[in-house]
Amino acid sequence: MERKHHFVLVHNAYHGAWIWYKLKPLLESAGHRVTAVELAASGIDPRPIQAVETVDEYSKPLIETLKSLPENEEVILVGFSFGGINIALAADIFPAKIKVLVFLNAFLPDTTHVPSHVLDKYMEMPGGLGDCEFSSHETRNGTMSLLKMGPKFMKARLYQNCPIEDYELAKMLHRQGSFFTEDLSKKEKFSEEGYGSVQRVYVMSSEDKAIPCDFIRWMIDNFNVSKVYEIDGGDHMVMLSKPQKLFDSLSAIATDYM
């Protein structure tokens, strides 16, 4: 009998747990348990991002979820986009609670540079952020950069293959957020004994315009993964544009990590 798994899903910046509304029932209908984490100042959390000044505070709901697991339970931890940073942070704390890390169109940090390294490299890329709105907030530890996505940027770079209804939903629900680059640049490197010891795989979309395939391949060359799964025709928001194909990839991962 095929073993069922507990999937813990971590959303991207500026969004919330609502992005998994198509994928969650697919996984549950296959018998898996699914926890879609709502990170701080995201989704329906009423706090503004200015009230969450560090990546540790932002990630606290994920850390609490893993802390609450039964002693011998292992999860498949899926981090989407900026969620790759969140799951690396969680794996550094709870490596024994994670069967495999799944980086889904995600930033893939390493253990040799500061945690902001891949974000710093990403921000050096040409292309710009179009009609996104930038601002800053003074925190106890310095300046925190903030961003609110513009509708043209969202349509062209994140949602270009999604049903129009999902794009309209995202315009209503997306929020101001942060990559916490200033905070991440001051943090200790992720450890080999923690994050570096956990199996990791990558799921990428063939038509991702937010984190381009060339950049994804550079990250994988920089910090290797066990296997790469590619979703043909998926855009950045692949859980909305190609939910069945994403389900198929996650099912394959679940089988590989029985």
From Swiss-Prot:
- Protein's GO biological process: glycoside catabolic process; response to wounding
- One function term, GO molecular function aspect: mandelonitrile lyase activity
Active-site feature positions:
S81, H236
Q: Which reaction does it catalyse?
A: (R)-mandelonitrile = benzaldehyde + hydrogen cyanide
Q: Which domain of life is it from?
A: Eukaryota
Query: At which residues is there a site annotated Increases basicity of active site His?
Result: D208
Tagged with keyword Lyase: yes
Q: Which InterPro entries match?
A: AB_hydrolase_1, AB_hydrolase_fold, MES/HNL
Q: What is its EC number?
A: 4.1.2.10
Keywords, comma-separated and alphabetical: Lyase
The role this protein plays is:
Involved in cyanogenesis, the release of HCN from injured tissues. Displays R-selective hydroxynitrile lyase activity. Also accepts nitromethane (MeNO2) as a donor in a reaction with aromatic aldehydes to yield (R)-beta-nitro alcohols.
The family this protein is said to belong to: Belongs to the AB hydrolase superfamily. Hydroxynitrile lyase family.
Assembly and binders: Homodimer.
UniProt-recorded name of the protein: Alpha-hydroxynitrile lyase
Give the organism the record lists.
Answer: Arabidopsis thaliana
